[in-house]
């Protein structure tokens, strides 16, 4: 046994000598160098037992949570230094004195009571002595002790003190019903940032949700963090309530939810979030529409403050993911489209206006009255700017944005701007100031330009491509933005490609207008171009019956590509001569660069020029009354084509080449069938081109001599002109006789040799000079003109064209000299103007009339003056009527002021002068409005603005897009004298003043003077009421008045009209209507009634359409029906010989102007009037008296209408005229002397006569004859008959221009739809089954593939390519697809794949192979609405057909041969991807809905891997037989994966072609949220940081060894990302429990503890 140790030995160290005094010193130093702690420390048992450190049981003296005596200094636990009684508080001093008197202290000394009962058992001294006894095991012992202590703590925290998952008590504040006042008080408290949120967060008001919630936080300007908290509480509460309802509903009839089920929680919550997003968008939309409702500064300021807050609130919601982002962005764009006139009727009108130029005067008023609600659009544009960086991430949203912005740009530029200086703008509510509108247009234009450069694929927008393609081109060529030559070239290239893609796929959006919100799914974003076709064409096919077809039967519009020959002809028919057409006629040059005014020449310019020149001379356009159209075309070629080439050396070569091509075409014309050519028009064409210096006579003669046709002179006995076998020689001899030459030895020599008498140019010219000197020049100088002038110049009228051109130039110069030298002042009156106009018109020289003579007259120089407004008004009306010619009259250079602008300036100057001398009762306001529309409107008079600027009064379609407005050249002629200068600013200012001017009625003196002159008699008080004046003046106009008296009567009547309408708008019309109806009902002869009405029309008291409206009350009265028909025909057509008896030449001109105005703006009514007029109850229309009287005029009118309004005439013919009469009428229009066409067999006989110019006649003949003959037949007989008809046309194909772009594509377009589909099927079968393939690469004598007609003389591939292209662009109904058709497609594709990878296809047969592929793709486009279902049902396991299409796009030919075909196929495959996916989804839903057990249709087996699309190298076999389709079932999951993998297509272009040109300078905005704000801003991003993960906790410390944590330091459990949804992140406001936050503390292995800090 060991000896018991003493107390001192136990307390001492076992090796005491080792420490010595040094250890004691160190301990003493530590003891007395203790620093005071910074925080209150306490022993654990003090708080538990409430024991005071000095023995007091009361806890009242403790500080909260510190354990330190109140007033005492902080100190360490178990350390209680003695303090003298002087340092104690007063209440402790007495206790201390008592202790000092204690007897124990006196006997044993002072000591402190131990903390524990036995100090020795605390082991503190023992452990301390043991640990410090040796340094050998000190570290190991400390480490082991520390490990045990750490394990003890860890076990206590994880087992005893750990916060349990069940302890979480998070609840959103409950909703309680409050009174209105309390609810308002609560919202005020919420908006008060000084009031703690915890005080009001115990409950939230019930009933504040959706738009009410947004309005509440906006009205109260709640701080954003509190507004977000309130929003989250409301949203969370709504979601919880919806979840309960959903779960209760699903518990009744819910199998195990499938992955595709729409009722899964994920999809349910997406739907809930989208509903909330819709509410936010609706509130924004409503708020934006209120922007124009405030009328005070206070309301405006309140609105602006609220808008600022709303924008901030929306940004916070967006950044915090409290909105469905893609859905919200889609709704923003929807705002921009809301309110645009995109209904079928308006779209059709807008499309029609692009191909016709009937907008010289404003016709439709719906554009004028359109209110675009700019507040709504500005708010949407602001939001687009804010979220711009996110919008760029969604390609399908960018696509919708690009289309919407283009449409907005289009309509905003068409609506008048508001100006406080211009009251002529009527709709001020729908207008905004011009500077603001221009800024909006600039912003939209810059955004569109950036989108185009960012991703051109987003401009695949075929919906309204025909409407907005010109707008896009105008924006891209913005003059205000400097562009390099390379950038302009790239823009041109990419625009052409986008244009091709849109025009190729234009059928895709014909039957459905899907809302972008239907496509805005959260997973829709992808790579560039991947979401072009988010809306499946399967759904489009099924929704055709319910969706709006913008091209319905009543608003039909044939879509044509811009380079289509038929479109060029259509532009020529409507004289829609724009820059685009000019570009198609420019010769090709490699050095020409794309500039703002001209682009590179067209490769097919020769063909296009041939079309233009043939149009000028074809007999199918001979319905024109004069040769003015030819003059317009010639001036257009000069000004818009040749002058834009510039004066460079290369341009001179191009002009020479252009002249040479014209001569070649003339020779070709001379060699063609003369029955299709009007020779007189050919002579006019040649003479005008010569006069414009486009070609020279010398060049023509050199070419003629070089041709050798006049090499051998004919025998004198056998005159060549009598030899019908040589029409070429006769044609050129006729041309020579009509050339404007005198004393040309070459010409005279040829004519002398080849004609019996030659042609004496000089003699005829001198005779014409003598007549014109006597009948024109002398009569003007002597003021002896009369209305019989035309009868005096019959000789001149019958001269050859060339001599008339020479005489016109001579008489113009002589007339100017005679007037200048005349000693007396010559007054220009309407008689002189009308006779001069008629003379120049007869001589086919209106160009000289307007360019030289009218300008000379208006200048009032050289003894000539326009003294009265009557003459000026006639000149103005003539300029307006012939404005198409005037605006293209070429000057010395392209940059010089146009003739039209010069004439407009002179008209305004003359008006200002004449207005001071007489009362203006003419309709000059129409003249000013027309001028304002025609010229380019400059906001700043001193600067040339962007070409995108539109006129203040632009009508339906101002001329900026399709026909650029006539530009005002602000650089004045430096040669002009300073005092004579009339600048463009002066012009603009004067025009604005005239637009502002109002009608000034005559004063009483003027009225009395007119009444006295007309010898009108009134009672004493009759003159006080102008209603009494009207009948008497009308009575006076019925009598035979002189022209001067008629003018005075019209002046008095118009004055009364204005004064009566100022009191009652309809009163005057009612007076006139009653008077006219009484006149018609009377026994007065029709001729006299017509004479009276024509005078009213001439003086513009009433217009023709108003007059016909007056007839409506008696139109159906049998007693007046015949009389009204005759009267109306006389008014709209008339006979010139009859009218000359009672109307002057100037009045006849005015009447023709009004007739033209009526025909152009009331085309439908005019046609119905004609057809109803010639229709008889019994007998043929050709026996109708009106047809006998006006037959030639009716045929001329119908000939013009059938060209310009084919669809209208087709419908009206069938409904108004019998079939036999329709056939005979059309046959006569085709050829008056031709054998009538009575049946389809007759049509087959003349099939070779069809061409591009008579196409409309044959289209209607086909329609009428097929309806007549095929309707009674059975289906199989109809098919056989149509097949014979089709074969007859294919065997007799004849193309005047090119088979790749011809009439055949639209030949059958007006047939009934079932016949059109039948012909389509026949052509498809012929292509798919009759195309021959040559697989022998060594057989070079055969084409790789070919398709010819049965005769074998025509290659049908280019013909079919053109047909299917035009069919896909213009058809508007769904084409069905059969199983046999799909199999034929598959077989053809398999053969085609063998061809496209061979070397032969890239050599001699490139065009045929391209045509075959193009045809195949067009067929897919036509059938795409019904083809998807066949692909899924018959080829749904392997999708071999689609794989073969992918092989085609990866083939050698597509990759190396044709970029356009590759892009088209790429677009088509993207379309198929979405369609196939939707079809698979639809079939899967049907299967799931038919299942009876949980998990029906699901499988656990993984699908086999699908080959990557880009690695397929061999063609696959065709689709499975349809018999297997019935038993085919797909695994939905594997099918989705297969489709997704299969369509993993490479981008068509790897790099952005604009990467070197794209800049953000013009789209940057201070409001735009940066990428950092979008990705890192808000609480949602902080809580969902990628570094935060969830890992499984390991609570094993209780059962592990002491060194468990040490032995495995690198072992870490697996983790998962930590995610919280935005509405779940709520600020904690409760103070009642520990674990009541939105995040459960158990997720962090949290525990509770109460201990001193280390």
Swiss-Prot record:
Q: Where is the composition biased (Polar residues)?
A: 1515-1530
Does Transcription regulation appear among the keywords? Answer: yes
| MF-aspect GO terms | transcription coregulator activity
Q: Which UniProt keywords apply?
A: Activator, Nucleus, Repressor, Transcription, Transcription regulation
- GO cellular component terms given for this protein: mediator complex
Is Repressor a UniProt keyword of this protein?
yes
Q: Which SMART domains match?
A: Med12
Cite the residue spans of the region called Disordered.
52-72, 1481-1530
Looking up InterPro entries in the UniProt record yields: Mediator_Med12 (IPR019035)
What's the chief localization of this chain?
Answer: nucleus
Highest taxon above the source species: Eukaryota
List where this protein forms a coiled coil: none
- GO BP annotations listed: regulation of transcription by RNA polymerase II
User: Where is this protein localized, as stated in its record?
Assistant: Nucleus
Subunit? Component of the SRB8-11 complex, which itself associates with the Mediator complex.
Q: Which family does it belong to?
A: Belongs to the Mediator complex subunit 12 family.
Q: What does the UniProt record say this protein does?
A: Component of the SRB8-11 complex. The SRB8-11 complex is a regulatory module of the Mediator complex which is itself involved in regulation of basal and activated RNA polymerase II-dependent transcription. The SRB8-11 complex may be involved in the transcriptional repression of a subset of genes regulated by Mediator. It may inhibit the association of the Mediator complex with RNA polymerase II to form the holoenzyme complex.
Q: What is this protein called?
A: Mediator of RNA polymerase II transcription subunit 12
Q: What is the lineage of its organism?
A: Eukaryota, Fungi, Dikarya, Ascomycota, Saccharomycotina
User: Which gene codes for it?
Assistant: SRB8
